[in-house]
């Protein structure tokens, strides 16, 4: 598996604002909780960028990334209600 990297400052901001960091994402990737992996829908603005959908505790997180021959670089972590409905059938709704 390729080395997974990220911006340290971005990681701190994500932990503070969203309660999840890139280390958590790597854990779930290694655990096999990738629900989908596709090209970013806006290739004009984000060329060569892909998005992993990671399932964590019945919730879907979108993780945009770029990959080269040496590494996978994670860009951000986006909790997604819409993806959760798609991949978990709205299980989180009370």
Give the predicted meaning of each segment.
Residues 1-94:
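Ribonuclease/tRNase effector modules and their secretory precursors
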């Amino acid at each position: 598996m390729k080395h997974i990297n990220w911006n340290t400052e971005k990681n701190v901001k994500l932990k503070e604002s969203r309660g999840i960091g890139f280390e958590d994402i790597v854990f779930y990737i290694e655990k096999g909780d990738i629900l989908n992996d596709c090209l970013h829908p806006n290739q004009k603005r984000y060329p060569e960028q892909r998005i992993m959908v990671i399932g964590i505790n019945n919730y879907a997180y979108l993780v945009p990334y770029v990959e080269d021959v040496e590494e996978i670089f994670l860009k951000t972590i986006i909790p997604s209600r819409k993806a959760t409905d798609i991949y978990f059938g709205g299980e989180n709704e009370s």
